[in-house]
């Protein structure tokens, strides 16, 4: 252990009396090391030696008053606290899984903890259900494209499933990161490699109804807001994802690889990662860089996870084509694309596994609180960490930064406040119905994940609505939409605007109302939007007259 080694070294360098204690004396910025050392020795009568560029080691019978000496930042007694190694998997190939250490998968625990079992849906190409790594790990499996979900001719689904839920400490092979997970396997990939949208939508619905806590979607289609002919947005897919979100399921999706986009790296996340409340995941390499294949996005790229040179399971029917290869059932014995596999698909799987561990460690947290925690505790990626294309803070390349499971598990602060109106992102059935004449409601907005909250308010003919927005810490706007509005996100809907706030800005209270009473009875939609990067809580008061 590091602590024992440090103590042994200091014992050789700094012998002291039997009743002496050892202290670390921190140096204030700009302090003269020699002057501080001399002052400490004179004050305590002890022995001082260098400990680090920012601290001294003191052997003395006491350190009272040392913290008040000029140039001293702190005094800490050593030996009272220590650190221990996190629990280490015993699987023989775990040392080859660099991603486990990169995201500090097990660093929060000294030994394998008992976390609640939860179901994770892998919506992909199926699984080699007879693989030893998945013995007792598959809760259910279903194919939505024909054939058996318990067979995988492509290998992609088995690789993803291994990263998430291969058996831990079973004495063979690799270590699945999400050790509490039970797999729900949905096969949606046809023999030609295509994923029909209908199959994906049905699979999402099935996974939710089967009790999935996390859904992994290592698939996607091109998003291009500048060219609608190329943009692959699907209302069917969006509705299926929304069903999962409303059911409290964490949905994790890959932001996509540039090989399917007009250029590389592509500047937009793929669908379904580019849907509200989905955790979009980009990839980073062993050296800390974000590869060019990983799509960028300033809004929908939430976190980065390992997505290069990963090692996982493969169907034994595929690895058997190389009978002389020793690691049958693992990617070393697979075809070329699995010998040095790279892609945001695999990064999404790592993030899904992380979501399982964090949700298990915070069993009372809701979906949006877990995803907020994963983003809030991510480690910022910059040129100092190996990512030259990354900027300080959130950026389009790595989102909030590198996934850090231990930081999320051990997070010392409060969880994000609950927004019980979510998801209420659009008009129609996606809105939150305000039923009483006067309502006060607290909610929140997030520029990157939840830009709009929409409230449905029924007004009688000749009625009037006054809305008051308070306690917002970011720029927000209010828009009232007429009955019949299908979406607040379409430009062609602008003719349906009944009223809107002007120059709201960072104010404590915003008031607006219809200057004349409405001529048409019906359900109006009140949209609250955040208009700048950031997040804010707010209080909305609506009064119908």
Predicted regions span which residues?
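Bacterial N-terminal signal peptides
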Residues: 6-15
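Autoinhibitory propeptides
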Residues: 29, 33-96
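C-terminal subdomain of the subtilisin-like protease fold in secreted/lumenal serine endopeptidases
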Residues: 48, 208-219, 226-227, 240, ...
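Protease zymogen maturation seam
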Residues: 69-119, 127, 132-133, 333, ...
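Subtilisin-like serine protease catalytic core
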Residues: 106-140, 147-198, 210-213, 246, ...
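Hydrolase catalytic cores
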Residues: 161-164, 184-190, 205, 213-214, ...
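Substrate-binding/access-modulating region of protease and related hydrolase catalytic domains
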Residues: 186-277, 287-289, 331-348, 364, ...
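Acidic, Ser/Thr/Pro-rich low-complexity intrinsically disordered segments
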Residues: 375, 398-401, 410, 439-545
